[in-house]
């Protein structure tokens, strides 16, 4: 019980010896040992004291009233308890009022600097929590800063964490002056702001001595001084000013001395007294540090344009706060910049006297470090006298053999090893390289020091390994050729510009399939869960027995799922940039839908004159895929975040399987591609879990087999060959029906229907004859094993139609419309006449087999004009020109990647043009198309609009990229020639995969851009003109060394 409460008790219930202590100390004049009531106990104001006094009066009973002792005690206790509770309630109410008043006072103070808002005449304040205002948000976006809330900015600028603030302790707003400081931090334009404190404001909970509540009322009265009548008013003012100025000057001198003690750089920096020339005082002040008054060493400039030594200003900022020591303008370490180069040149050209005793040499300030290090070396040499026990003169360390160097440095090596084990965990290499780096810096050999530092940090002084790998791949260098170039460049320049082969192999591992972990949900059926699978044999997993068909082939492939994973990881940046471009959050995990175009094509003769191994067919088949687009399902909408810009480029057509086999060999083709197709079918019903951008994301795949020519479509879909009566792979029309009805057909065939028809063909459930059964199944004669999309391959359509026009030209020259019964010799003569004329007029060289380039040049108005010179009839001229004109209007519709954007008018006119084209064929060229029509003419006239309406394009889904890949295959095979064809195929597959890597393409494009802009390696430092002329990175051919 407190003293106050004990004194307030009535006499009946007070302690019997309560008065004794007071009587005792009065008697002996001894001061009582009771503590004085604290400030908290004195917080009760006068109103409370009056209330307490009144309650005391009510509690005390009059002596005249007679009450029994027991009743008197009970009554006194009840009244005392009731009044005590009332007193406590009043105290609590007062505490609540005090806290409310405290919070109201806090609302008038700045959270950061503690200044009252009343000092600002505009009463401008800003909330501590919540998003920033529009002006600040615009500034942050302009400076590309990520922070968008006040707590982040306050923590960054003032190093104050306001996230844990309590409203009863901390103010909730800050002043406009602090707001200006934040703006100045993120803008380059200086503004006059002043931060009134050197340290952050510390806020305490409310108490009796609360500074927030009592500061305004606690004023210090000025001592009243009698007026001095002896002096006049002016004399008094002058004296006061002199006293103030003297105080300020003394304070400035004191501050400078404190700052000099903080920096303590007199042993490191050069004094201005060492200047060899008697420069003007103002000039000396401009080249000296404002803190230590020495010559500027590693000078830096503040925002307020004062100059300091870097170490001096950083030391002062660390101790005294973020202000300029000269003008106390806010200054942060990040604001320090190097002065202009012309000023540095002036500083380096100053002549100074060497401070070393017995050395009066005058040297330039810029070369003082090297001069001083020479003194230090001489001093060290004087202290160290090498022991030479006679014999031949002592040789320099670098001229010794490696064994002799080890012997001489044996003691030093032992000491370095002991230091490394004691201090650096045994890392001797790091200690030695750091010693070497410091030695280079001390000798001002900064160029070599930068190269060594780059090597220590893993960057290397030359090109990045990925750049070297991109150069090797894009210049078609084999490993041995690259290694020869690497050794030649290193020997000629003396530097390691290119990286060694082992660094390139490390870089390419991350780009090849089988490197990145992934998972399928549910797991793929009949596919291993092992993700570290690289190049595998195309025949692996194929059960063979003695009775099986013998397979004479060499096949190498990637597993389909690992190849897709590697392709997606290679496109990681494109995926994230696409999400950013569509304003999607980068943490969305999908599901992503990936649309894949599949291509397969056979190559002709790929024979080589070298290599050992089994006698395999000298024909090849390539299976490849292209990631066409990636979309994400977000808010019930499918948003496309990636779309291949050049879907027919060989740079995006990734190889999946290479085999030396004939595409006409159905058994071999089925044996090799069946495992691959099984993986494809398994992936259709599963989802891929792959980490993209550090977040696990979900991918689904849609496979579209569109990059097949007609021959291969018929092979894999089980249809009869191209000369069949059933001429179309999209509909069931026969050749006669197609010639009679040239335009009006629709797509009816599908992979599922072909499988059903094969079962009918195999089982013949209706016991029909061969002709009846063939008519029922519409030309299906084998089991389909690859699902293709019923479509037109634009490239082969172009080639097929050009071949047909080539024949029409010959027939028009021979006037077959008059004489249909021409002999074979006459037809051969027409062809020779046409070839000779095209060579002369169009520079078209005759070809045994028409290529895409020949078809493009042939199908032009100029060619028709040239051919018409060989035709006599003007009417035939008009018919032929109109036919070519209609074809050239129809061609862009199926050749363009997006006809709705690239040629919308021709797309609208396609139906009319195709009908007019069909009318010309059936009238003017009836001699050729009566009762028959070519396969591609039928597809061109009948199915193009329907396919475009379904897919949006025909050209984008063509096999042109795969055809370009065929050319690359031949080139890679010549380049990677090895003794074994097995390893040769692996090299070709690996090299071709890396050639299609978007990651390497970015490096190569950046490298070419730098070279084209003139940022090539300096001749004195790198390649330049010192390279032999036969080594050129711009060459497209293999380098012969």
Curated annotation (Swiss-Prot):
Its cofactor is Mg(2+); Mn(2+). Its main location: nucleus. Zn(2+) 3 binds at residues 304, 306, 324, 327. Binds 1 divalent metal cation per subunit. Mg(2+) or Mn(2+). The record marks 894 as: Essential for DNA hairpin formation, participates in base-stacking interactions near the cleavage site. InterPro entries: RAG1 (IPR024627), RAG1_imp-bd (IPR035714), RAG1_Znf (IPR019485), RAG_nonamer-bd_dom (IPR023336), Znf_C2H2_sf (IPR036236), Znf_C3HC4_RING-type (IPR018957), Znf_RING (IPR001841), Znf_RING/FYVE/PHD (IPR013083). Residues 390-457 bind DNA. Zn(2+) 2 binds at residues 289, 292, 309, 312. CDD domains: RING-HC_RAG1 (cd16530). Its EC number is 3.1.-.-, 2.3.2.27. The keyword Transferase applies. A zinc finger (RING-type) spans 289-328. GO terms for molecular function: endonuclease activity; histone binding; metal ion binding; protein homodimerization activity; sequence-specific DNA binding; ubiquitin protein ligase activity; ubiquitin-protein transferase activity; zinc ion binding. A zinc finger (RAG1-type) spans 350-379. A divalent metal cation binds at residues 601, 709, 963. Pfam families: RAG1, RAG1_imp_bd, zf-C3HC4, zf-RAG1. It catalyses: S-ubiquitinyl-[E2 ubiquitin-conjugating enzyme]-L-cysteine + [acceptor protein]-L-lysine = [E2 ubiquitin-conjugating enzyme]-L-cysteine + N(6)-ubiquitinyl-[acceptor protein]-L-lysine. Catalytic component of the RAG complex, a multiprotein complex that mediates the DNA cleavage phase during V(D)J recombination. V(D)J recombination assembles a diverse repertoire of immunoglobulin and T-cell receptor genes in developing B and T lymphocytes through rearrangement of different V (variable), in some cases D (diversity), and J (joining) gene segments. In the RAG complex, RAG1 mediates the DNA-binding to the conserved recombination signal sequences (RSS) and catalyzes the DNA cleavage activities by introducing a double-strand break between the RSS and the adjacent coding segment. The RING-type zinc finger mediates the E3 ubiquitin-protein ligase activity. This is V(D)J recombination-activating protein 1. It comes from Gallus gallus (Chicken). The gene is RAG1.
């Amino acid at each position: 019980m407190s003293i106050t409460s004990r004194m307030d008790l009535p006499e009946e219930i007070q302690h019997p010896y309560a008065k004794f202590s007071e009587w005792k100390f009065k008697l002996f004049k001894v001061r009582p040992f009771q503590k004085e009531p604290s400030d908290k106990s004195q917080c009760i104001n006068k109103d409370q004291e009056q209330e307490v006094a009144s309650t005391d009066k009510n509690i005390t009973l009059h002596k005249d009233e007679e009450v029994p002792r027991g009743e008197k005690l009970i009554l006194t206790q009840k009244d005392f308890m009731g009044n005590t509770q009332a007193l406590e309630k009043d105290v609590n109410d007062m505490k609540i009022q005090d806290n409310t008043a405290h919070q109201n006072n806090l609302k008038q103070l700045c959270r950061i600097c503690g200044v009252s808002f009343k000092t600002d005449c505009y009463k401008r304040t800003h909330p501590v929590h919540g998003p920033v205002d529009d002006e600040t948000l615009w500034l942050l976006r302009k400076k590309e800063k990520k922070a968008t809330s006040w707590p982040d900015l306050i923590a960054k600028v003032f190093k104050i964490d306001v996230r844990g603030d309590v409203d009863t302790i901390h103010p909730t707003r800050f002043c406009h002056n602090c707001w200006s400081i934040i703006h100045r931090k993120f803008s380059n334009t200086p503004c006059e702001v002043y931060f009134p404190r050197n340290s952050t404001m510390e806020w305490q909970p409310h108490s009796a001595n609360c500074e927030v509540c009592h500061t305004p009322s606690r004023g210090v009265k000025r001592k009243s001084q009698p007026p001095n009548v002896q002096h006049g008013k002016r004399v008094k003012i002058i004296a006061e000013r002199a006293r103030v100025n003297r105080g300020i000057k003394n304070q400035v001198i004191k501050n400078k001395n404190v700052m000099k003690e903080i920096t303590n750089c007199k042993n490191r920096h050069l004094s201005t007294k060492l200047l060899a020339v008697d420069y003007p005082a103002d000039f000396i002040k401009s080249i000296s540090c404002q803190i230590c008054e020495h010559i500027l060493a590693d000078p830096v400039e503040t925002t307020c344009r004062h100059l300091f030594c870097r170490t001096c200003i950083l030391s002062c900022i660390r101790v005294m706060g973020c202000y300029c020591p000269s003008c106390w303008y806010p200054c942060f370490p990040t604001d320090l910049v190097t002065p202009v180069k012309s000023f540095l040149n002036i500083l380096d050209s100053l002549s100074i006297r060497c401070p070393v005793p017995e050395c009066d040499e005058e040297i330039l300030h810029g070369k003082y470090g090297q001069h001083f290090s020479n003194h230090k070396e001489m001093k060290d040499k004087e202290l160290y006298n090498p022991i030479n026990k006679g014999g031949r003169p002592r040789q320099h360390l670098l001229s010794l053999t490696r064994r002799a160097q080890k012997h001489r440095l044996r003691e030093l090596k032992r000491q370095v090893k002991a230091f490394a084990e004691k201090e650096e965990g045994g890392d001797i290499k790091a200690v030695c390289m750091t010693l070497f780096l410091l030695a280079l810096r001390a000798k001002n050999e900064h160029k070599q020091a930068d190269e060594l530092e780059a090597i220590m940090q893993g960057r290397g002084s030359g090109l990045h390994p990925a750049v070297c790998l991109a150069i090797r791949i894009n210049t078609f260098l084999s490993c041995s050729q690259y290694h020869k170039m690497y050794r030649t460049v290193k020997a000629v320049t003396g530097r390691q510009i290119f990286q060694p082969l082992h660094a390139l192999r490390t870089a390419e591992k991350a780009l090849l399939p089988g490197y990145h972990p992934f998972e399928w949900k549910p797991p793929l059926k009949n596919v291993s869960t092992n993700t570290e699978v690289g190049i595998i044999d195309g025949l692996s997993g194929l059960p063979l027995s003695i009775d099986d068909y013998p397979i004479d082939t060499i096949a190498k492939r990637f597993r389909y799922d690992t190849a897709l994973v590697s392709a997606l990881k290679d496109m990681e940046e494109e995926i994230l940039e696409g999400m950013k471009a569509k304003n999607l959050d980068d943490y969305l995990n999908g599901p992503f839908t990936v649309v894949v175009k599949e291509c397969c094509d056979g190559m002709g003769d790929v024979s080589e004159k070298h290599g050992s191994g089994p006698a395999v067919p000298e024909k090849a088949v390539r299976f490849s895929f292209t990631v066409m687009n990636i979309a994400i399902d977000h808010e019930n909408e499918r948003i496309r975040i990636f779309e291949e810009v050049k879907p027919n480029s060989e740079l995006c057509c990734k190889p999946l399987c290479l085999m030396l086999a004939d595409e006409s060999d159905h058994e071999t083709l089925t044996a090799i591609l069946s495992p691959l197709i099984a993986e494809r079918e398994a992936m259709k019903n599963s989802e891929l879990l792959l980490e993209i951008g550090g977040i696990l994301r979900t991918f689904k795949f849609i496979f579209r087999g569109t990059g097949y020519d007609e021959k291969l479509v018929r092979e894999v879909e089980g249809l009869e060959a191209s000369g069949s009566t059933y001429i179309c792979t999209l509909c069931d029309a026969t050749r006669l029906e197609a010639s009679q009805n040239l335009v009006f057909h629709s797509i009816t065939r599908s992979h599922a229907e072909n499988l059903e028809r094969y079962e009918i063909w195999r089982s013949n459930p209706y016991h029909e004859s061969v002709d009846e059964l063939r008519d029922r199944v519409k030309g299906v004669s084998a089991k389909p094993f690859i699902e293709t999309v019923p479509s037109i391959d634009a490239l082969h359509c172009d080639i097929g139609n050009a071949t047909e026009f080539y024949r029409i030209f010959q027939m028009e020259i021979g006037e077959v419309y008059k004489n249909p019964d021409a002999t074979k010799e006459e037809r051969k003569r027409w062809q020779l006449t046409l070839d000779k004329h095209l060579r002369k007029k169009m520079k078209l060289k005759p070809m045994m087999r028409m290529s895409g380039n020949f078809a493009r040049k042939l199908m032009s108005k100029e060619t028709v004009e040239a051919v018409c010179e060989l035709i006599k009839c003007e009417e035939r001229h008009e018919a032929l020109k109109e036919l070519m004109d209609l074809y050239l209007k129809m061609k862009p519709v199926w050749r363009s990647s997006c006809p709705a954007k690239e040629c919308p008018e021709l797309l609208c006119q396609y139906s009319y043009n195709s009908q007019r084209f069909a009318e010309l064929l059936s009238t003017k060229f009836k001699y050729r198309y009566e009762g028959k029509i070519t396969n591609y003419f039928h597809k061109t006239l009948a199915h193009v609009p329907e396919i475009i309406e379904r897919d949006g394009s025909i050209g984008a889904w063509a096999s042109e990229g795969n055809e370009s890949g065929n050319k690359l295959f031949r080139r890679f095979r010549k380049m990677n020639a090895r003794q074994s064809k097995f390893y040769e195929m692996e090299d070709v597959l690996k090299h071709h995969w890396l050639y299609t890597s978007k990651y390497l393409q970015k490096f190569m494009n950046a490298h070419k851009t730098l070279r084209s802009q003139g940022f090539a390696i300096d001749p004195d430092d790198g390649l330049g003109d010192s390279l032999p002329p036969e080594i050129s990175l711009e060459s497209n051919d293999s380098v012969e060394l």
